[in-house]
Amino acid sequence: IDEAYADFASHNSISLLSKYDNLIITRTLSKSYSLAGLRVGYALASPALVSVLDQAREVYNVDRLAQAGALAALSDRSYFETTKTQIIKLREELRIEFDHMGWRTIPSGANFLFTQPSRQGDSGPDTAADLYEFLFDREILVRYFPQNQLTESYLRISIGKPAEMGILMDRIKEWQTQEKRK
């Protein structure tokens, strides 16, 4: 089970470890600990399964810089908890804002929202593309997935710092008041 975003969710799968000997839960420090560039993670499993995984592990599987970053991040639990709580709070505030604007937003247990923007009654692929381009032109980067019919009307918006989220909302409100682009 991939639990890359488990720290932002209300539930996790750890209790399943005692029920299933063949279960492996993987986690990363990339998301909630903000160590994406260091590629540090870990696995949770039964002792027998950990032994098998350990036999396949490479000798130098985590470099010294990544080890130092991970140790520093893991040793400051207070900062982690404060940051995690802030991200969850900002995510919920943003979701509520989107709800008030009539956007469809998928429930999230991660550090991002997957939302279908709407403007002047239109919430199709052209609307998502238009907002994506509008934000990009203002150096605000969100993810857009036009290659799939299921996702072409949605944007994935990562949760940043409070000031960044304020700027994002200001730009979205500015976009909503503009005429549709041709």
Question: In which residue ranges do the predicted regions lie?
Answer:
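Short acidic/glycine-enriched loop/turn segments that link adjacent beta-strands
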Residues: 37, 109, 149-153
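PLP-dependent enzyme catalytic core of the Aspartate aminotransferase-like
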Residues: 134-138, 143, 147-182
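PLP-dependent aminotransferase class I/II
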Residues: 22-99, 103-106
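Short loop segments at secondary-structure junctions
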Residues: 45-49, 76, 117-121, 162-163
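Conserved PLP-binding catalytic core of the aspartate aminotransferase-like
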Residues: 87-88, 98-138
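Active-site pre-lysine segment of PLP-dependent enzymes
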Residues: 3-32
